[in-house]
Amino acid sequence: MALAVALGGATLPAHANDAALKELRQQIDELRSQYESRIQALERKLEQAQQQAQPAPAATAAAAPAAATAPSAVAMPPKSLDNRFNPSMSVILSGTYASLKRDPDSWELSGFQLGDDGHGVGPGERGFNLGESEISFRANIDTFAMGAVTLGLEDDHGIEVEEAFVQSTALPNGVTLKAGRFFSALGYQNEQHAHAWDFVDAPFVHQAFLNGQYKQDGAQVKWVLPTTQYVELGAELGNGKSYPGAERNSNGLGATTLFARTGGDVGDSHSWRLGVSWLRAKAEDRLWGGGHDHDHGGDEHAGEEKLFSGNSRLWVLDGVWKWAPNGNASSTSFKLQGEYFWRKESGMASVQEPDLPLEEGSYRSSQSGWYLQGIYQFMPKWRVGLRHDRLSQGTVRTAVEDLQPEEHNPKRTSIMLDWSPSEFQRWRIQVNDDRARLGIKDTQIFLQYQMSLGAHGAHSF
């Protein structure tokens, strides 16, 4: 409008002086300059918007000449990849109260030699206990790998590195690699952290044959076959220092694990998985810390040391069946889970007691066990469970008298009820009818809480 006024004002009377004409021309020039500046600014904004809308390769190509001048520089991935160290962190707080009829210090699996200082072996201490709390960190390293660390917190073991591994995320053909420390894929429950268990304690087979839970320091490879039926094959190679192995001053492999799994769906409401696993571990001076079949009332075996050197082979058959109406487990569901273990060991064993000569000789054993448990969610947030454990002493042949077991097949029946007011907390009561010791019945009552803080990944099938 100012321009129109100025142009209209240009039709001046003939008597207008030169000064007025000059002033009008200056005003017109100023207006023209302002409009040209605004048009140029709008053109620059349009050009910038077009550049930002272009695909990332164009920006990469534009930066190529600069990169060529510095060949020693580390190539950085595109900023569009969110690979910054921003791990998800979670904390699991767990605690228990235990009421035990029998002294837990006398607990044993009669007929079985247990590992020394087992993690999760036995009913634990009476009264209030911290239980097993854990802190976990997990993050993508880049587009090809992720990493995870889980620290366990316990009164007896202090701070323990439960898991610390890196795992591939982008290998082709269904292959996944893992390296570091991790819970072995042996059987079904061994891979799970304690807060994911359906009962307070581990099954007898895990306590007797894996000293509670088996960790592997080494590498793992998994391969999901390209078939319509889900089939997964895997192998693990490690140092074998965890029970049934032992610390070894050797460069060779101490343990090998092989496993195969298959599963699928039956209609919309049922799913299943079957697995078979095999573990071979080499033990050198493996310490046995419990499981003898003698009276604990005195100091008869104070300072006694039992050692085993040889081979341990373990076969595991596991199965899981899950039901949820139309696949919706929010209101009601059922899970049936079971595992069968069979172990064979052969080698040399020795027993050293204070002020007595060393007893040593050959040792061969073949022992087995199983458990079966069912978990029924009868309404939202409420579940009830029943579990039965049983071990078979099998055969033990040894020339070492103190390793000759008394005849006993430990068994236990457990019932539990838990309530989860939200996905971040669970309260549980459990009662065990424990007959692990020869001629002794122990009624065990547990109260447990579990709280989850922060982001926590979904559990496996």
Which ranges hold each PLM region?
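Outer-membrane beta-barrel pore domains
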Residues: F165, H270-F461
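Outer membrane beta-barrel
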Residues: M76-Y243, S250-D268, S366-S368, Q373-G394
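Short N-terminal amphipathic alpha-helix/helix-capping patch enriched in small hydrophobics
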Residues: N17, R38, G124, N129-S133, ...
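N-terminal periplasmic/intermembrane-space "pro-region" immediately following the signal or transit peptide
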Residues: A14-G118, Y230, L453, G457-F461
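Active-site rim elements
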Residues: P244-R248, E305-K306
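Generic short alpha-helical segment signal, independent of protein family or function
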Residues: E47, Q54, L171, S184-G187, ...
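Gram-negative bacterial Sec-dependent N-terminal signal peptides
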Residues: M1-L12
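Acidic-residue sensor for enzyme active/binding pockets
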Residues: E23, E36, E43, E47, ...
